[in-house]
Amino acid sequence: MNVKILVLVAVLCLVVSTHAERHSKTDMEDSPMIQERKCLPPGKPCYGATQKIPCCGVCSHNNCT
């Protein structure tokens, strides 16, 4: 009897975790924060690959182009 209960609990945990993982991936794809990318417009100063916000185009001679 106890083994059946343990198996049932294990199966329920597996189903719930799979369901939660599936919804988590959907939430990340739909999130506006993930889709929105900030970038520096042309003419703004830049410092290459070490800067936090990249250029919308290319960093050339310390200016975004």
Curated annotation (Swiss-Prot):
Signal sequence annotation: 1-20
Keyword check for Secreted: yes
The keyword Secreted is annotated on this UniProt entry: yes
Annotated S-S bridges: C39-C56, C46-C59, C55-C64
Location(s) in or outside the cell: Secreted
Main location: secreted
Propiece span(s): 21-37
MF (Gene Ontology): calcium channel regulator activity; toxin activity
One GO cellular component term noted in the UniProt record for this chain: extracellular region
Entry's family note: Belongs to the neurotoxin 36 family. 02 subfamily.
Protein's name in the database: Hainantoxin-X.2
Organism: Cyriopagopus hainanus (Chinese bird spider)
Phylogenetic classification of the source organism: Eukaryota, Metazoa, Ecdysozoa, Arthropoda, Chelicerata
